[in-house]
Swiss-Prot record:
Pathway info: Amino-acid biosynthesis; L-arginine biosynthesis; L-arginine from L-ornithine and carbamoyl phosphate: step 1/3
Underlying gene: argF
Name listed for the protein in its UniProt record: Ornithine carbamoyltransferase
GO MF annotation, one: ornithine carbamoyltransferase activity
Keywords: Amino-acid biosynthesis, Arginine biosynthesis, Cytoplasm, Transferase
Family: Belongs to the aspartate/ornithine carbamoyltransferase superfamily. OTCase family.
Record-listed L-ornithine binding positions: 166, 230, 234-235
Keyword Aminoacyl-tRNA synthetase tagged: no
Domain of life: Bacteria
Disulfide bonds: none
Amino acid sequence: MSTVQVPKLNTKDLLTLEELTKEEIISLIEFAIYLKKNKQEPLLQGKILGLIFDKHSTRTRVSFEAGMVQLGGHGMFLSGKEMQMGRGETVSDTAKVLSQYIDGIMIRTFSHADVEELAKESSIPVINGLTDDHHPCQALADLMTIYEETNTFKGIKLAYVGDGNNVCHSLLLASAKVGMHMTVATPVGYEPNEEIVKKALAIAKETGAEIEVLHDPELAVNEADFIYTDVWMSMGQEGEEEKYSLFQPYQINNELVKHAKQTYRFLHCLPAHREEEVTGKIIDGPQSIVFEQAGNRLHAQKALLVSLFKNVEEPS
């Protein structure tokens, strides 16, 4: 560990990327790149991370469990439905009890307010593994992926096309924080949350970022360095079939990407529905880096875990 220092974060928890400064984000990314090259660093020897899941997961569960093992600790899976919290115990009581047993909590659930309460009532770090409003760990991995490709955020344009969902929200805050240009194109009625857009615009004024929310996908991807999409229907929305016709013009396909830079890279948080939000030719093509992006979830989260756990041990 002589080459890279553990980032000092001015927060106990990570609930949204709004809580981190640009400098903290960059230091986390650089630390994640170090950990990617040095997988077996036992920096969390004997530490236990509780993993609370109310939503199905592949990448989040496996990357957090594998990350804790590689760091010398242990990830403990806790099904939200099987815990007493799922049978009426308050979030506050759950937070206080878990703080007696384990060293940190990662929670993947529906209500962002529940995660905020869990963090407020816990004496240990709480990480938002996804809520209906935010997906900060994904955005951190996305920034890492972009940084590995470009070694900068200055002058980089990220175009997000599709549903203005939790992933979009976290990317807006992330782009604003690091001073990147981000355009969002959604159908009318599916724009990102207005309050989150306002927050991103306010941050952008301080960092020099550009944030645009549009309805024209061609305009959004014009001269883009990175094109990003997500599924049109998030978990719990599967009955909204009428969305398909509205979203069809927002599919990432050969026609749409002609408007981006020739050297563009394609991003997707996965799971993907081929021939819906993206064609197979794009996601499986040479300019797609979605699996490198998925791999970076592991490394970005390891950097975050070490930083948050060390902050508890050595408070500033």
